[in-house]
UniProtKB/Swiss-Prot annotation:
This is Probable UDP-glucose:glycoprotein glucosyltransferase A. GO terms for biological process: protein N-linked glycosylation via asparagine; sorocarp development. Residues 1-25 form the signal peptide. It comes from Dictyostelium discoideum (Social amoeba). PANTHER family: UDP-GLUCOSE GLYCOPROTEIN:GLUCOSYLTRANSFERASE (PTHR11226), UDP-GLUCOSE:GLYCOPROTEIN GLUCOSYLTRANSFERASE (PTHR11226:SF0). InterPro entries: Glyco_transf_24, Nucleotide-diphossugar_trans, UDP-g_GGtrans, UGGT_TRXL_1, UGGT_TRXL_2, UGGT_TRXL_3, UGGT_TRXL_4. Its EC number is 2.4.1.-. Its cofactor is Ca(2+); Mn(2+). GO terms for molecular function: UDP-glucose:glycoprotein glucosyltransferase activity; unfolded protein binding. Glycans are attached at N81, N148, N174, N391, N1233, N1338.
Amino acid sequence: MARIFKFFVFLLIVFISNVLLLVESNEGDNSFSSKSIQLSLVSNWGETPSYLEAAEFLHNQDKSLFWKFIEEFNKIDFSTNYSDKIYYESTISLMKSVLSSNTQFLSEFLSIDLAMRTYSPRVETYRQLAISNMKLNNIEHSITTADNKTITLFNSGGWVQIKNKIITDVNEINESLFKDVAVVDDEENEFIRLYDFDHIFPTLANTVSSSSSSPSSIPIVILYVDIKSEFFKLVHPKLKQFSQMGKIKYCLRYVVQESNQKLNLQGYGYELSIKNLEYKVMDDSAIKKDIIIDGVKSKTIINIPNEDVQGFNFHKLQKRKPELTSKLSTFRSYLMAKSQEAKELKVWELKDLGIQSAQKIIQSGDPLRSLEYISQKFPTLSNSLSKITLNESLKSVIESNQKIIPSTTDQTLLLNGRLIDTNELSPIELSRIILEEYEHSTTIQQQGPLSSKTVQDIISAQLPIRIQLLPTKEELELNGGNEPFVSLNNLELDYIYRQWEPKLQSSVLDKPVTSPQDIFIRKNLLTTVIVLDWNNINTFEIIPEIQEMVQGNSLIPTRIQLLFNTKSNNNNNNNNNNNDQNSQTSNFIQGKDLAKVFLTIKNSNLGNRGAFFFITALNYFKKMYIPNELGITRSVLSSSFQAVLQQMGGSVRSLQHALTNTDFDNLLESSNQLIERLELLDTTTSQSTTTTTTTKILPKVFVNGVQVKYSNIDQLSFDLLVSLYDEFDNLKPLFKESILSTTTAQYYETILTSSYWKDNNLPFLKKLNSMISNEKYSHLITNSKNRNQEVDAQNVLKNLLYFRNNENKDEQNLLNLIVIGDFDHYNTRDISLELLRQLEKGELKNCKLTFISNPIDINSVVNTAGNENQILGKLITILKHYGKILTPQLVIGLFEKVQSDPTIIDSFKTMKQIIELSGFDIAANDIWVAQSVNLFKQSSKVCKQYLGIQSTNKSPLSILVNGRIITPPLSYDDAASFIQSDFKLLLEIEMIKAKKTFELLNSDPILKDKSNLKISDLLNKVQSLVGYYYNGNNQLDSNIKRKRIPNSLSISFSHKPPTLSSSSSSSSSNSNDVPLKFLMIINPFNKVSQKLVPMVREFSNKLNIPVDVILNPPVSLSELPLKTYYTYVIKLSSEFNNENVLYNQPLGIATDIPEDRVVTLALDIPSSWLVQPIIAKYDLDNIRLKDLGDEQVLTAVYELENIVIEGSANDMTTDNAPAGLELLLNPISTQTNKTQDTIVMNNFGYYQLKSNPGIWKLTIAPGRSSDIMDMVDHPNQKEKETFVIVPHRLVVIDSLYQSLSSLSVVRKAGQELRPILQPIDEYEKQKEQEKEQKLKQNSSGFFSNLFSSKNDATDSVATHQKKSNLDTIHIFSVASGHLYERFLKIMMLSVVKNTESPIKFWFLKNYLSPAFKEFIPEMAKEYGFQYELVTYKWPWWLRKQTEKQRIIWSYKILFLDVLFPLDVPKIIFVDADQVVRTDLKELWDMDLHGASLGYTPFCDSNKDTEGFRFWKSGYWRQHLAGRSYHISALYVVDLVRFRRLAAGDQLRATYDQLSRDPNSLANLDQDLPNYLQHYVRIHSLPQEWLWCETWCDQESKSKAKTIDLCNNPLTKTPKLENAVRIIDEWTTLDNEAKEFELKIDQSKHHRQIELDHQNQLPNSKPIENIDDILLNLAESQKDLF
């Protein structure tokens, strides 16, 4: 019994011990690590001074402020060597001194830009300009001074460039200025070439374009100078004086001292993804203990950490059995992987995790900070979050919000209603947007001054303009009495809406809409009409969006009706003189036929679902087969129709039946008539289905006749919902007046035929007048960045003579009418005369009227009669000065006299004649008459440059109505009818707006002077600014989009910055009248939110901007939504240490990462950055914080290696992408002298080149490309006659971020039909000729060597010569992580030892460790091979991969045509984990039989893995149709043929289509070429070229030419174990590589220590106060969770 009891106790102890161990192993998910990861990113250029960056900030804001800053800076005494802090504080102080009271806010933005180093690339560009200028002048860095001292030219203070010589002696400058500038310079001279960013001293000659002394006729003098130097103090005043005299054009360029210190950058993030350890990928030598051998640290001893993993202490086991270290390490990794799997949440625990997370955020003391914390640390916090008791009411609120928020919208960021694109948002871009919006708001506020609330109320005021979108009786009769609309749904009858509220509740009608439920009513109260032009391919893009509205998860409370246009605007078929075009377009299906097929399917038993599926199929087949065509071909239509029948069946008989069906002819004709009558289509050229024009026009959408404004198709559902809520509120008065009721039969007709709109002076149009619907504004005043231009503009605008109705002197003059035009033109005078007449009659009420001359051609001096031009325009310019003696009647009289005889205007020879004709009491020699010419030129300049209005022969005049630009058409019958009809209607609309604005201004609490005159003047300015900034087609930036959020959306929480919160109780409200507010709709689990939230929070706290947040998490989850940790690096303040040295080191510090988790690090960087790690002790691909041992911080430093230039090229001759065009990027003023080359892709004409700050020259490469194409200077010119051919284009890289550029090329005469890519038959012929030539040379060499004598020494030389004469074999490979780099070294050794020919290795740089990049040059020297590191930035248009492994796979196949220089003819890809056993020359020379790719088929001989051969069954078997499925571990690419076939374009286009489905392309690098081998042919290599144990039997191993370590899905054995077991020579090669690495470590040790001291990079070790930072982080986060 006692034995049984003891045994039971023993079992219990074992059980408890194992349970405790299991609990301990699973605690990692909730236990925070005390260790952290510290990452920094530095520039590859040297530090730049903060005061120069500040000067560039000012130059960017206002050039006049820049020169004020320079003048003040020149007064500072720099004899003392000041600290960074003194320079910084002096710069900020100096900045404030040159700013006016209205622009002091700029100092805050300066401090932000200094912290972000925004202008450092610009300063670096100046540094490179100065260096290149010295090289250009053949000047060494060192010069001898007058006292025989040798100093560097940079340290001398500077020099002056005059023509082709430089002057360093101050005493010589005066003489040279008088003597050497006598002859005009050629601005193309590279010595004195100027750039757009240059600092040109402002004088009349270079600021007034109309000056008789053109800037190009003034000699250029460039001062290269250190602005702190004594040289600058002496030279600047001299050059300034000469410039003010108009003698020179003075350009100032900085001389910037070179620096070894690098910039610390920010505006990037990094994620830590939990690693999948199914297959062991950690190097067993990666966890190493440094030991000392002869005083040198060496990494050779594997040291397994002293820890328990699932009950085993592998550290102790290693000590007992050191010979089993490798196997112990493998088993340890296996258990670690199982441990990570055990921490996953169950499905039922995941369901409410989204709501629980939102609940935790809202309940936090600082919700915005909690939002950031949870989104960045979610994997660690998910367990705790899942245990929160669910708040059902919060869930209901979020569900209600999501009825409004489109399902495709995870995040939206608005600033004062401005929609901010968050996908590529950087802190620098967000700072620019905030500054722009701040300037807009404050400019409006300062006009009063006004409160920010008044400004926001004016901005948000909406005026619905309704159109009578109903058919006439005739149009109804044409369609058999039916309306010409195609209905998609019926809210009152369709089953899907059965649960909606059936009646309108009175409580809803008595208050504004506050809940989404308010409008979800089962009534057709809100009807949306969408006008679809079947001749416009955008139709096919919008229909899937419409489908989501009526069939998707987010039903929208509106009846949707489609109105079809099938009447083609394309006249090509009737254009008899363009037979080529006719034949080209005949293959395209007409819009009418497409509409008939759609309607045939819709009216069949397939209904909406079938019709929508048909459009989806059209989209798919079009993008698959004709992605670059803008039309639908017959084959695409046929494939789409067949797809419908195959997928859905249905009763539709055939495509031919649908095309010949006449049932819908009357419907389509009726709808065409309605569209034409109401002018619902834009008259501009649309994106036709039969032509290749590219103007994108969005389909028009109306809600109960009110047009919905939306910026793009993706935003339609959201913007439509906002319009539905607005319209619901608009209809409430109709219910109160019993016009509508719950029993109304036809809501739509009743609403559009009601007299309510006209009775209440609300705009109601009988047709969509484009002049009214297309809003465009100019500004009457603005916060211009050009102060001189602002002063000139206000001088003109404040000196205008306004005409008013004298009988109504008490009128408020709410409308300000300014006629701007060419008064030599009949129409300008005609409209002006009629406006004056109607003003005098009292027809134009509450209006004031004035005129500004704006000639069509300012340089035209004389008219057709040979007399002085623009006499009337010049007279009008000076009318203000005679306002007391002029009346409207006098001016009317003048216009009438001129109009009575139009030829009289050309007969005037002097101003005196027109004054006499006018009867004005003005002396001909009056001073203002004498000044009329200059004033006339000034007013014209203001119109063109400030107001943005150009007079042309087609549009000789424009009328500004409170800033709104109206351009009368030349086709009007007469001026009176135009003004009484269209123009009068527009004035009525603008008057309604003005009255609302007047009320708001009158009630403003800040505005003191509220007299009619003051408010009238204020209103005119405010209306123009609001329209210009917010409501119209913004002239500042047409890409700016604005969005309104319905009031019914519930705000989850509001964030008030600390400054605002602390001062909220202050009595002084004015000081906190912040004109800005963020609104953020955010899904906490979206990857964009991980960087967006910290960015918004940082700017909010820095600039005191409040933030409203609407949380938008998924309401139900089935898997973990975020599996990565994330850290974003942003710091908007500059800090200094105790020595007053700039200590602004933006760092990405990741804390709270479980120590036992294996994570992989991936950078999240801007699209135009290429970076590389330069310091990393540990494997960043396999990070486990426990492996740090005693170290607390894992440090990594990356470097910004290149700034990428991305562009889109267009062949203007054919309007297509010039695919295959070769481009060169040559450095002019940059750090590097290396030329970059690339080819243009067919995909969007995309090209990519690497650069750095400086100036580059983009050219077409010599050869076939330059023989065919020329570069064009003006990419927007469409007329070939205006093309300006240029030899190159200058590219200036002076910012951290580069936007997409455009490049236009045109074909040379006679080259219109010649293909850019050499045809394959030409290529084959050329190849044969080269082969024959080579054979001749080889045979000649053989006979000459046969009779030559040799000795041992010459034998060696000959052997080397023989090898060098052979073709270089180019080997490409990729690797990531220390294990695969170890494999890579072994692969390289196996290649070098077995291949006789010269070898050049190409490695993908992106993921190589710093250690490997330091090692590879030494290995290349030792083993005699070449190598090069290559990279390519993922293009913006190509669907991105997010998982690192899939990104690496992508690089193996997607960019082969552009990854390597154009002179590389062929590459062989060899996997890193492969060993080569043969001479690769055999594979290099192998005939690919016309294919561009050679791959080895998968082995079929190992029957154990038969069940894993997926390509033998199902989809793959059917798709391959007897072709082989190939393995991607080894392949050869004929790059020349590959490019000739545009194979890269086909691979990318197919990838982009297939990758839409996340379940496709599971093995991306392998599946893609195999899938596409029908089009990009693959030559199957003999089987022996690749052997791997997983798929091949053992008998075939002896023939293997390469052996690959394929993963085995049966055993999942780690690769290291397989390598030792399978490959006999692997251990020998591994040891050789290790021994060589040890040898290199020892030889470099002392030299490396010395270099580390000399060139120490910032952040190469943990910063001194890292403990303080971590402590502060822990303290700040303690209350977040």
